Design a protein with these regions (language model features):
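Hydrophobic/aromatic residues within transmembrane alpha-helices
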Residues: 40, 52, 106, 118, ...
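Loop-to-transmembrane-helix transition segments
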Residues: 18-26, 74-102, 185-193, 242-262, ...
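Helix-helix packing/entry segments at the starts of transmembrane helices
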Residues: 21, 55, 113-122, 206-224, ...
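Transmembrane alpha-helices of multi-pass small-molecule transport proteins
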Residues: 2-3, 45-98, 149, 195-200, ...
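C-terminal transmembrane-helix exit sites in multi-pass transporters
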Residues: 123-148, 155, 288-307
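Hydrophobic/small/kink-forming positions within alpha-helical transmembrane segments
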Residues: 31, 35, 93-97, 101, ...
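Hydrophobic transmembrane alpha-helices of multi-pass small-molecule transport proteins
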Residues: 64, 142-176, 305-324
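Glycine-/small-residue-enriched transmembrane alpha-helix faces in small-molecule transporters
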Residues: 2-55, 165-206, 227, 332-348
């Protein structure tokens, strides 16, 4: 192995490797978080979904503002210009109410193995479209083919939705069956959640590409989302059910929040280094992970459609590969080196 330091010419390649590693770490973190969320999911309990989503979002806001505070005390630029705050805060509200909350609702009907890949259809399509037309990021042939495979995977997994929903509902209410209309609505909800996540990803990348650090970008975004969830919960129930949370749900909620904050920072840092489409496709590996966890741990039915969809997901990610197209490397080579996730944490 060479001990020579990397040259300036290798900077784009290093950015690709860092971004790829962060994207994969985010996938693992979100799989852990989503598994914990699946453990506490309840069908037809919107107020509970609000509370679970609030618990999930709180650590992100806390960590982001803690980093911002320390950076400010050290005299470093901590927050973006107030001119971009409305955009970030709107994305934060959309990500929580349209993303995390809808995702939690879908989990209570579809289960883990189906909700995650269906959500990624929305993420990939919205991220690809907005990345192309808003950020000017090209969608190459391999990425386009990967998108097609992942959409086919989601379609295959969607065919298993009725059986999966019956199993999930039966676990919550003995002998009950899922309403077909509720199943269709849950699929639409998961797709909508993915679109909300896709918009958030483009907003994060659009601002970090302008020199705004990870924590500075996430601080106003996560705060707006947390406040909107809190207000919605108070309007819905009139209370914040901190003391009334069942003891058996507290550890999964803590695990979900902790894993979510790690995954959130990883994906935000990855979006600094690699295009939205590539980051989303790497992070989509959690679809395969969710399928395994859903079947093995939560006893969701391992149908042929589920196995086919998981295989298509793996094929789509394998096609993507780990090398960045030359055109993207060339575009990055003239840019100054940006802050990595490790630097965002270590240099606060």
């Amino acid at each position: 192995l060479s001990t020579l330091p990397p040259t300036a010419d290798d900077a784009p390649g290093r950015a690709v490797r860092v971004g790829t590693a962060l994207g994969l770490c985010s996938a693992v973190g979100y799989t852990v978080a989503n598994s914990a969320l699946r453990d506490v999911s309840r069908p037809d309990d919107f107020a509970w979904s609000l509370w679970v989503t609030l618990c999930k979002s709180a650590p992100v806001a806390t960590a982001a503002w803690a980093i911002v505070a320390v950076r400010a005390l050290r005299g470093r630029k901590a927050l973006p210009s107030f001119a971009v705050w409305p955009r970030l805060m709107a994305a934060g509200v959309l990500a929580q109410l349209g993303g995390n909350l809808m995702f939690q609702e879908a989990l209570g009907v579809l289960g883990l193995a189906l909700t995650v890949p269906v959500t990624f259809t929305g993420i990939i399509l919205s991220g690809a479209a907005l990345g192309r037309f808003v950020l000017g990021e090209p969608v190459g042939l391999r990425q386009g083919a990967s998108i097609v495979l992942l959409i086919a995977a989601t379609a295959s997994l969607g065919m298993a939705a009725p059986d999966a929903a019956d199993a999930v509902i039966a676990q919550a209410v003995a002998g009950a069956n899922a309403d077909p209309a509720a199943v269709a609505f849950a699929v639409a909800t998961a797709l909508a959640a993915g679109c909300a996540y896709g918009v958030m990803g483009v907003v994060i990348r659009g601002n970090t590409a302008q020199g705004v650090g990870v924590a500075g970008t996430l601080a106003p975004l996560s705060l707006a989302g947390f406040l909107s969830l809190s207000a919605f919960l108070l309007l819905k129930t009139g209370e914040i059910p901190l003391t009334s949370t069942p003891p058996e749900a507290r550890l999964p909620l803590l695990l979900a929040g902790t894993a979510n904050v790690v995954a959130f920072f990883c994906i935000a840092a990855a979006l600094q280094r690699i295009p939205v489409v590539r980051s989303n496709l790497l992070n989509a590996s959690q679809a395969a992970m969710a399928g395994v966890v859903g079947v093995v741990w939560f006893r969701e039915p391992p149908t042929l459609w589920l196995l086919t969809g998981t295989a298509l997901t793996i094929a789509g990610l394998a096609l993507l590969g780990l090398r960045r197209p030359r055109s993207i490397r060339a575009r990055l080579s003239g840019r100054p080196r940006e802050e990595t996730f490790a630097e965002a944490v270590e240099t606060v």
